[in-house]
Amino acid sequence: MSLELQVRQLATPSQLLVRDLHLRIAPGTVHTLMGESGSGKSSLLAAVCGTLDPALRFDGQVLLNGLRIDGLPPQARRVGILFQDALLFPHMTVRENLLFAVPRGDAATRESQVNQALLAMEIAPLAQADPATLSGGQRVRVALARALLAQPQALLLDEPFSRLDAALRARMRELVFDLVRQRNIPALLVTHDAQDVADPALLTRLAEPG
């Protein structure tokens, strides 16, 4: 599995954000995009997962495992995303949030996958919890478990550690990067913090928009 991003241009109606960018992310690796606010980092992720604001113009291609996915609807792209704010359904328990992500199948298999994820993320005691009662680190774990239960073939990380304190941030980085390696899927991380970089050899700095 590999994720490839070929960008000729990414622009707003009045401003060029990104030009002539080519990334190929190998399985089990995390490539980092760094840039200031407004440099187009999050918009690039939106172009990959299919949620780009229609006001922006993306001229390029997104390939997953050699196949173009930029013409597919978001739900067909097999790309997971972890946001800065761990977006959990507030009307569902933690278990129900996870079950929602599991692909269709028999009930017993789906429940088993959720149970395994709860144990793997060390959040089993929180299965029946209201998401509003979770700490920042717990929310990241639940959101990550939900993203992986959808069985993505690539993972996007939109500054998911930025709201955590320094110690928790380090632990969550290690958890996420380890899971990317274990699942052997490509991951693309955007951040403005150099401490979040998974591998300095896999780092692209975006220029200020102009």
Regions found by a protein language model. Name each.
Residues 53, 67-84, 104:
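ABC ATPase NBD coupling module
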Residues 53, 73, 92-111:
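ABC-type ATPase nucleotide-binding domains, specifically the catalytic core motifs of the NBD
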Residues 109-126, 177-178:
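Conserved ABC ATPase "signature" region
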Residues 130-134, 138:
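Conserved ABC ATPase signature
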Residues 155-159:
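Catalytic Walker B motif of ABC-type/P-loop ATPase nucleotide-binding domains
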